[in-house]
Amino acid sequence: LNYGCMTSLALDPIEKKPLAQFHSGSSILSIGSFGCNFHCDFCQNAIISQENHVEYEKLTPEEVVNLALRLADEQGNIGIAYTYNEPLIGYEFIYDCAKLAHAHGLKNVLVTNGAITSKYLMDLLPYIDAMNIDLKAFTSGFYEKIGGNLELVKENIILCSAYTHVELTTLI
């Protein structure tokens, strides 16, 4: 449904992902689509994560990677960050981009709520260099309210930290 539909593209400081301990001071091409599997009242990006009528530009994985490579040459870009909305709801596009970017020596950063089955996560992890996982709260009741599962997120935090660089965010 949202394969290649980019609502946002920007060259951002890596610290904006936010990642404090991964290539500090560098820039990364940040891309995002629309949609999310959670429904948080406090969402910073609700306009793109929860709205049905969002403007977007259709891009292929090759176009995204070529843009990232051009920005690497021109502005020191280190890779691609999948962010703004919940990128894992567009898993196939993220997987295709990450695999291609990895083959070209670009870094892949995933900014996620961590709600994905371990099988798909394990397939993607070889191509992910760093993650910021948003731990929304630490109660099961809160996760039930927003449509998630705290235990799944905690399990994925542990799983991911065994394979790649992981930093956590708790917004509220």
Residue map of PLM features:
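Short, basic/glycine-rich phosphate-binding loops at helix/coil junctions
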Residues: 42-48, 136-137, 165-166
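Alpha-helix N-cap and loop-to-helix initiation/capping positions
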Residues: 56-59, 144-152
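Conserved strand-turn element in the central/C-terminal portion of the radical SAM core barrel
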Residues: 140-145, 157-172
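Short beta-strands and strand-loop turn motifs
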Residues: 78-83, 134-135, 166-171
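Acidic/histidine-rich catalytic cores of soluble enzymes
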Residues: 131, 136, 140
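Conserved Radical SAM active-site core
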Residues: 2-131
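Short, well-ordered secondary-structure micro-motifs
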Residues: 120-122, 143-146
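Alpha-helix initiation and capping sites
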Residues: 118, 137, 147-154
